[in-house]
Amino acid sequence: MKVYNTLTNKKEEFLPLVPGEVKMYVCGPTVYNFFHIGNARTFVVFDTIRRYLEYRGYKVKFIQNFTDIDDKMIKKANEEGTTVKELGDRFIKEYYKDADDLNIERATKNPRATEFMKEIIKFVSDLIEKGYAYEIDGDVYFSTKKFNSYGKLSGQNLEELQLGARINVDERKKDPMDFAIWKSQKPEEPAWESPWGMGRPGWHIECSCMAYNLLGETIDIHAGGSDLSFPHHENEIAQSEARTGKQFAKYWLHSAFVNVNNQKMSKSLNNFFTAREILEKYDADVLRMFMLSGHYRTQINFSMELLDSTKAALDRLYNSINNLENLLDEVKNEGLRDEELKYRDELQKYKEKYIEKMDDDFNTADAISVIFDLIRDVNTNITIESSKELVKYALDLIRELGSPLGILQKSTKASLEEEIERLIQERQKARKEKDWALADKIRDDLKERGIVLEDTPQGVRWKQI
């Protein structure tokens, strides 16, 4: 298996520190709002990588944190007239709802930064003691010049960074590129007691501390969105390696951005979508397959038209699964014949090809293509004359290859019922808003698929015709 390591800018053989075990840390959300589709891609990508590592037999300890104290949290809490803790509690709950709906497996642990204050203060104290950090008026800064390999992850040159950092620089810092690892308390801000007075941690120290305390001095994989490479991950490396004198993470993985209609997603451009908004209209399988339809290191373009295309492709996959499920009930032949044994062995080549693609830096786009090829083959060669064993083998193989991607696991009957109920809710909403055109379109679209809606005093009922 090969992975692209941002630290070395090349694909490397994946060799974890302990054979058969993987320690993986992914930077999670700042819990002040619902997560958007850009965040969703990061979460889906690394959930898939974790699933695939487990599929290949690794035991994965997967940590994804919650940043529950930082400037954004404080600003939002003040705007809403609530506390930072209450805001964090609320949006952690909302995160779990959306992540569960997106079929993202729960992490081994989701630590909150505020649960690690004692450990963070110890971390900061150790850096001061070792000469890598200094305190001024209750603020503590990390001295980037003291860490000789600063910039090694992002390829940034410290001298060039210093030239670019001289605008609005804090004059108290010894160097413009020094960054805060402990911040003194400001009015109306939550704070904790420390040897430097009341204050709170800087963002970068939080992840370093949680990774150290939950996974140890050196971890196998550290991952996150590409926007975190600098300065967040660069600063994590500096702090962690300055403290321990050991390599912080062996492999660094970064997922690329999501653009919306070929533009960067932003609220000002009115092209900002939360995952929850999309999941109200599309099944999780659709959003996951869309997110995985490009290589994780390549930017993808998001649009409703592209989601519709993904849904149509996914429907074809599920139609084939549905046909196989029906066939399993209908076929009479039992026991694999000689030619079926041979054909079953031929189907194994798809599994081998799938593993080959995923072993090459988790190439989900090509892996999905392999699943389509498998289904085309099965559609052509498995019929009512096939044996139950062969039909079941093909069905199980399709689901097996879909599993690491988090797709194709639903019973088609359950999936259909779920979609119909979702469309009924959408139609009810349209009627409430007097959008009769949309309400009629949903009804007519369902009728074309053989689903008739009946409006009754007890609510909307549906039946297949």
UniProtKB/Swiss-Prot annotation:
It is found in: Cytoplasm. GO terms for biological process: cysteinyl-tRNA aminoacylation. A motif ('HIGH' region) lies at residues 29-39. It comes from the Bacteria. SUPFAM superfamilies: Anticodon-binding domain of a subclass of class I aminoacyl-tRNA synthetases (SSF47323), Nucleotidylyl transferase (SSF52374). GO terms for cellular component: cytosol. A motif ('KMSKS' region) lies at residues 264-268. ATP binds at residue 267. Coiled coil: none annotated. Its EC number is 6.1.1.16. Its cofactor is Zn(2+). Binds 1 zinc ion per subunit. InterPro entries: Cys-tRNA-ligase, Cys-tRNA-synt_Ia_DALR, Cys-tRNA/MSH_ligase, CysS_C, Rossmann-like_a/b/a_fold, tRNA-synt_1_cat_dom, tRNAsynth_Ia_anticodon-bd. It catalyses: tRNA(Cys) + L-cysteine + ATP = L-cysteinyl-tRNA(Cys) + AMP + diphosphate. Gene3D superfamilies: Cysteine-tRNA ligase, C-terminal anti-codon recognition domain, HUPs. Keywords: Aminoacyl-tRNA synthetase, ATP-binding, Cytoplasm, Ligase, Metal-binding, Nucleotide-binding, Protein biosynthesis, Zinc. It is an enzyme of class 6 (ligase). The keyword Transcription does not apply. GO terms for molecular function: ATP binding; cysteine-tRNA ligase activity; zinc ion binding. The keyword Nucleotide-binding applies. Zn(2+) binds at residues 27, 207, 232, 236. Monomer. Belongs to the class-I aminoacyl-tRNA synthetase family. NCBIfam families: cysS. This is Cysteine--tRNA ligase. It comes from Clostridium botulinum (strain 657 / Type Ba4). The gene is cysS.
